[in-house]
Design a protein with these regions (language model features):
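Conserved pre-motif I regulatory segment
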Residues: 1-21
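SF2 helicase/translocase NTPase motor core
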Residues: 3-6, 28-31, 37-141, 145-148, ...
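P-loop (Walker A) phosphate-binding loop of NTP-binding proteins
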Residues: 23, 53, 159
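Conserved G/P- and acidic residue-centered "switch" motifs that form tight phosphate/ATP-binding loops
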Residues: 25, 127, 157
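Inter-lobe coupling linker of SF2 helicases/translocases
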Residues: 89-90, 96, 100-121, 136-151, ...
Length: 258
């Protein structure tokens, strides 16, 4: 994962922009977290937006907090509407929380476009970015807006190629428009700088891991009651990060007991 951090934050890159295209199982989420944590350490990660498919929202939020101590407020459409009602009409709702994680299906809505075009970010992450490559779609429109409004851009996809060279070129264009020539061909030197693509048989992976791949086990989920100390921490986090006013519900869900 250190390779990804070094490449993304290489001084030669005026803006940290990269496509993490490692195959499944090589730790793209860890690479994302390490890059973001280093940006924060350098004072370049105050405002961060993570955009993911809905089904991985909670997992991504948990990984960022548990592994890198990076708290993100998870927002859905209801939560965003609550934020809009709690701030003056002239204030951009996406300026309220400095670090947010929102599903792409929520964020691509027409109702948020004007706000997103006016909001700057230090870093934007788009997970499973192969879903934003089709020109003219709502997903692609959202990605294009965010790419223009951020300094650092991290795209992550285990399948950046879908058989159509134009799809891969679109990912590169989001990172660096000048890397796609007028004839549609790519600047190969720029691609090498912008893309990390490894699989289990890559030399770097083989040198580190060898053949020591463990078989994946089926996860077993058990419901465990929290301790009083854990309840206290959860309450403090909820009051500090989620509640905007007394008796307000968390932006992403209902009030406790409702």
């Amino acid at each position: 994962q250190l390779t990804a951090v070094r490449q993304a934050l290489d001084p030669a890159n005026l803006r940290p922009r990269i496509l993490l295209a490692d195959t499944v199982g090589l730790g793209k989420t860890l690479e994302i977290g390490m890059i973001l944590a280093e940006l924060v350490r350098r004072g370049r990660g105050e405002r961060i937006l993570i955009v993911t498919p809905r089904h991985v929202l909670e997992q991504m939020q948990h990984e960022m907090w548990s592994r890198f101590a990076l708290p993100f407020v998870r927002l859905d459409s209801v939560g965003i509407q609550r934020v809009r009602r709690s701030v003056p009409a002239s204030r951009n709702p996406f300026s309220v929380f400095h670090r947010a994680i929102i599903s792409i299906d929520t964020l691509k809505s027409d109702r948020y476009l004007n706000h997103l075009r006016k909001q700057r970010w230090d870093a934007v992450v788009i997970d499973e970015s192969h879903n934003v490559t089709n020109k003219g779609t709502l997903n692609n429109r959202l990605a294009d807006i965010l790419a223009r409004q951020t300094d650092a851009l991290i795209l992550a996809s285990a399948t950046p190629h879908n058989g159509d060279p134009k799809s891969f070129a679109e990912l590169i264009r989001l990172l660096e428009p000048t890397a796609v020539r007028a004839d549609g061909n790519l600047d190969e030197e720029a691609v090498r700088r912008l893309v990390i693509r490894r699989h289990r048989h890559s030399d770097e992976v083989r040198d580190v891991v060898g053949g020591r791949w463990k078989e994946r086990l089926t996860p077993v989920n058990r419901l465990v009651a929290p301790s009083p100390a854990e309840d206290a921490v959860a309450g403090e986090l909820s009051r500090t990060w989620l509640h905007r006013a007394d008796d307000a519900a968390p932006p992403g869900g209902r009030k406790a007991g409702s």
